Amino acid sequence: MGNCCPPGSSSEPDPPPASSGSSRPAGSAGAAASPATISPSAAPAPAKPPAPIGPVLGRPMEDVKSIYTVGKELGRGQFGVTSLCTHKATGQRFACKTISKRKLSTKEDVEDVRREVQIMYHLAGQPGVVELKGAYEDKHAVHLVMELCAGGELFDRIIAKGHYTEHAASSLLRTIVEIIHTCHSMGVIHRDLKPENFLLLSKDEHAPLKATDFGLSVFFKEGEVFRDIVGSAYYIAPEVLKRSYGPEADIWSIGVMLYILLCGVPPFWAESEHGIFNSILRGHVDFSSEPWSRISHGAKDLVRRMLHSDPKQRISAYDVLNHPWIKEDGEAPDTPLDNAVLGRLKQFRAMNQFKKAALRVIAGCLSEEEIRGLKEMFKSMDSDNSGTITVDELRKGLAKKGTKLTEAEVQQLMEAADADGNGTIDYEEFITATMHMNRMDREEHLYTAFQYFDKDNSGYITIEELEQALREKGLMDGREIKDIISEVDADNDGRINYTEFVAMMRKGDPEANPKKRRDVVL
């Protein structure tokens, strides 16, 4: 990994390569002739004025596409899109996280992005942290080019293997804690630790594990207290909910991950985010259900210490690494964990993905009538026939249609649609955004989605139909689909009827909520 400077250093960690058209003062080294020999008619054109300074990164604007070819989308988050990108000069592949400036609606949002870049540069060179190759800013977005972790998410690798042991879980956890111990020793709290944020560098069996997504991370000093509630619901520590926390909150999140690794479900569970938070504050950790009777005393002891409700009494990263269960050649047994654990782990991963897939189906499977109506609406709003709609055209168009939206809702609709942050929305973006503003659980939308999966119109979704539909989206293998059927299939007939489908779709999904700052009343 390349050298980096901590925030505040005057040197750039990743200076942009000089473009082929970069200007050099006449008379500088390598000039073809001295100023005295150049006639006025042959004098070079004056140097271009420097690029304006970007308001987010505070450095000259630069077009990331002049250096990288941006390819297919890899993922989408609250603030932007991650795409595959290729360095034009070397052909090397990276991941490019594009953060739309239109989505950065508050001063805190801008500061979060700026700090994310600073923290990633600060942690550069650490083997367990995804490397930031460069940060670029143009008029519409900030682009973070990072090393590509092509091996996928940690839990997906475990599921694909089909079996694992306490010893393997111990080894994984040791790697995760080593990474976070390094972050803490360098004055960084991650604040959003969860399985999805640990990726494998490649598909190789022994590929290194990398921590990613430092968008909520902060620098900290010893004794400093943080008060904003951030993170992903299942993994948030109780002191975060009480608005008084430090680096110990990361240990809690890893403790939740360990609990899931050992039994397949989160320790704090409810049908809503509010319910999960209350469960976290109660702090009761269940070791009575199976498979805990077959899990070693050492593993349970470490989970208890990591999930201690009092952060002052919680085990530190250093002490976790010295715990007998986690030490290399320690006491973690090599006997396979119960197959039921893997089944539950699959369900925990697959259910979230199935619901996301179904929501995408709802957004993408509009009836011809709806599409025709929305197409006409788009045309009528596009007053200058440019093929795109500005926020002003959107506002006026909605008012003409008698749609009563507040200014904030109009802005929300615009921001939801404008994925590339260029200030306008095209037809496809408009369709997606219009659906986004509707309630996704409306009866007709749910029925449309159900029909999409029910290929033979039998009134049931079978394993084969679900597999076919989800394979089209490249989401799951057959085993995961079987697990989903059994989870949703309330009457145990081996298939999903409409009532069961609706119940699944309307069930609380806390992870669908934004992970950003929350106002929580408990």
Curated annotation (Swiss-Prot):
It is a lipid-anchor. It is found in: Membrane. Its main location: membrane. SUPFAM superfamilies: EF-hand (SSF47473), Protein kinase-like (PK-like) (SSF56112). Its EC number is 2.7.11.1. A lipid is attached at residue 2 (N-myristoyl glycine). The keyword Transferase applies. GO terms for biological process: intracellular signal transduction. Activated by calcium. Autophosphorylation may play an important role in the regulation of the kinase activity. It catalyses: L-seryl-[protein] + ATP = O-phospho-L-seryl-[protein] + ADP + H(+); L-threonyl-[protein] + ATP = O-phospho-L-threonyl-[protein] + ADP + H(+). Residues 68-326 form the Protein kinase domain. It is an enzyme of class 2 (transferase). GO terms for cellular component: cytoplasm; membrane; nucleus. Residues 1-12, 19-45 have a biased composition (Low complexity). There are 3 contiguous domains conserved in the CDPK subfamily: a kinase domain, an autoinhibitory (junction) domain and a calmodulin-like domain. The autoinhibitory domain (332-362) inactivates kinase activity under calcium-free conditions. This is Calcium-dependent protein kinase 14. It comes from Oryza sativa subsp. japonica (Rice). The lineage of its organism: Eukaryota, Viridiplantae, Streptophyta, Embryophyta, Tracheophyta.
